[in-house]
Amino acid sequence: MLKWIKARNTYNYKVDLNEFNGANNYPGYFNCIITPKNLVMFENRFTRSVKRGVSFEAAGEVCFWKVYKFPNRDGLTKRLLNHLSVPRNWSEFRKAIHEIADNPSYGNFKRLQRACSQPAGFALPLTFLAFYRPTAYPMADRHIANWWSENKAKHGYEVFSSFIQENGGRIIPCKQSWDAYLAWKDFCNEYSVKLSKQCKSYWRPRDVEMAVWQAQKKNLSLEKLI
């Protein structure tokens, strides 16, 4: 349990939204630094925007946050913002997120891919889902996929699929990867309950995911919880 706490507490992903080179075109957005201390507030802002339909710009902020380390982060963010600035596209994006949150089928995942103009994407569409409902859904990227492949048996999930990855680690958005994500989601939900009970503090599936992400990056071994 202590290793889980250490991993979560040392998670330090920091993003300066001001660095988006199109920030001046979106007053009131892209104007703060996101750290673990205000990450939940950032998630909640996105959730409110989707539920109320008031500001597609919040989705652009989440996109920039996710692809911050990418060399083409500005282009990816601008493409999404241009796409969602069309009212019917923003409406479909909101519907797609709500639908997959209530019914996480592969078909609804494909719908979300299209809705966020990421027909070949995996990590970014799931980032929107995880931000929308962090009490149920974790994120997944190559670091998570690597950890899952190496550790799922240790934690009692050996019969479940691994993510299909390219040589560079990128997750291929196929049915097997989706099935692996559903198992990963179940694991995060299971461990959020165990950690909340054993740590006597609230852990969400998103918190479990962040601990795993940090552990994989720092080569920390996380113990199996009973």
Task: Identify the role of each PLM range.
Residues 126-131:
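Internal, hydrophobic cores of structured domains that mediate oligomerization or house catalytic pockets
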Residues 1-116, 134-226:
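An N-terminal alpha-helical hairpin/helix-loop-helix interaction module that forms a charged
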